[in-house]
């Protein structure tokens, strides 16, 4: 777009700054797992990001392994039972896809029957990230930085 609008130098500088932020935030593999879950709408069941798509890359750059990495699909319908089987060390909970706040997303997730049996939940290892953190935008870079900071042990 920088070429189209004759702002290449500004666009290139902004892209370089984002690249530097990603490089600065990127962390080596931690050996920890995570499930990045979300609700697509107020009526839809729990969903998760699979191994395809930007969310999987953000988890990997944060040094985490997605418990749904084997699925090449980017978007999955999941159940609490599936989470219990996969035992993620961290829960990354996306919010805001349909206008819900972080607090509303957390309350909805914690109200799911059986979720209290997840070790990540009982240990308080839930990271809330805005919906934009899983899409190609500068918000994804901020989401990576927030995720790395929140999952530092």
Show which residues each predicted segment covers.
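His/Asp/Glu-enriched short active-site or ligand-binding loop at hydrolase and phosphoryl-transfer sites
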Residues: 51-75, 95
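Solvent-exposed loop/turn segments at secondary-structure junctions
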Residues: 39-45, 73-75, 96-100, 132-135
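Proline-aspartate-enriched helix->loop->beta-strand connector
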Residues: 79-93
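Extracellular/periplasmic catalytic domains that process cell-envelope and extracellular macromolecules
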Residues: 28-30, 84-86, 119-122
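Extracytoplasmic/secreted envelope proteins and their assembly/folding machinery
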Residues: 2, 12-15, 19-22, 52-59, ...
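Basic- and aromatic-lined ligand-binding clefts that recognize polyanionic substrates
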Residues: 9-62
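Structured C-terminal subdomain patch of bacterial secreted/periplasmic proteins
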Residues: 3-6, 90-153
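Second-shell loop/turn segments in exported
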Residues: 1-13, 42-49, 69, 130-137
């Amino acid at each position: 777009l920088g070429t189209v609008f004759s702002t290449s130098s500004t666009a290139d500088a902004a892209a370089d700054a984002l690249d530097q932020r990603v490089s600065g935030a990127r962390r080596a593999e931690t050996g920890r797992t995570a499930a990045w879950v979300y609700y697509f709408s107020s009526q839809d069941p729990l969903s998760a990001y699979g191994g395809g798509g930007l969310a999987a890359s953000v988890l990997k750059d944060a040094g985490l392994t997605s418990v749904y990495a084997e699925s090449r699909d980017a978007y999955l319908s999941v159940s609490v039972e599936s989470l219990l089987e996969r035992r993620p060390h961290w829960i990354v909970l996306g919010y805001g896809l349909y206008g819900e706040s972080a607090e509303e997303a957390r309350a909805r997730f914690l109200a799911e029957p059986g979720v209290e049996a997840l070790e990540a939940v009982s240990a308080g290892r839930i990271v809330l990230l805005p919906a934009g953190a899983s899409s190609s935008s500068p918000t994804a870079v901020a989401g990576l930085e927030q995720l790395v900071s929140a999952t530092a042990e």
